[in-house]
Amino acid sequence: MFPFALLYVLSVSFRKIFILQLVGLVLTYDFTNCDFEKIKAAYLSTISKDLITYMSGTKSTEFNNTVSCSNRPHCLTEIQSLTFNPTAGCASLAKEMFAMKTKAALAIWCPGYSETQINATQAMKKRRKRKVTTNKCLEQVSQLQGLWRRFNRPLLKQQ
C-alpha cells in the first residue's frame, strides 16, 4: 500500500511542477509588435556604451558566445531573459545601468511590455545587498553583447 501512496504523491507533485513551468512559458512576452528601429537606436546611443563600461578590463575573447537568436523578437526574448532572470553564479543584472535602460526601451517601444513585467519585477525584489561582479556575470554580459549585435544586423528578419 505504501508504494502506491508514495507514487500518487509524487505524480501530483510532478504535475504541479509541470503546470507551473508551463505557466511561466505562457507568461513570456511576445516581442513581435515592438518598434525595432527605436530599440536599435536606444541600444546604439546608450545601452551599448553601458555594456562596454561593465565589461571594461575584460578581453573580448575571454568568453564564447553560446546564446544565439534567429530574428529580432527572438533576440529580444533572449536579451530579456539573460538580463532579468538570475542564473547560477550571477544573481541578477537587473540593477545595472544597461539593464535599466534596456527595460526602459522595451517598456517604451514594446506595447504592453511594462504591464507583463510587473509580477516578474516584484518577484525579483530579494537581491544581494553588495555588488559583486563575478566571472559568470561577465560571461552573461558578453552573451548580451553578442545578442545585441545580432539584433542590430540589417538583414536580420523582423519575425
Swiss-Prot record:
Gene this protein is translated from: TSLP
Name of the protein in question: Thymic stromal lymphopoietin
A Pfam family assignment: TSLP
Tissues with expression: Isoform 1 is expressed in a number of tissues including heart, liver and prostate. Isoform 2 is the predominant form in keratinocytes of oral mucosa, skin and in salivary glands. It is secreted into saliva.
UniProt GO BP: antimicrobial humoral immune response mediated by antimicrobial peptide; cell surface receptor signaling pathway via JAK-STAT; cytokine-mediated signaling pathway; defense response to fungus; defense response to Gram-negative bacterium; interleukin-7-mediated signaling pathway; negative regulation of apoptotic process; positive regulation of cell population proliferation
Protein location: Secreted
InterPro entries in the record: TSLP, TSLP_sf
Quaternary context: Interacts with a receptor composed of CRLF2 and IL7R. Binding of TSLP to CRLF2/TSLPR is a mechanistic prerequisite for recruitment of IL7R to the high-affinity ternary complex.
Top-level division of the source organism's lineage: Eukaryota
Organism: Homo sapiens
Lineage: Eukaryota, Metazoa, Chordata, Craniata, Vertebrata
GO molecular function, one term: interleukin-7 receptor binding
Glycosylation sites: 64, 119
S-S pairs: 34-110, 69-75, 90-137
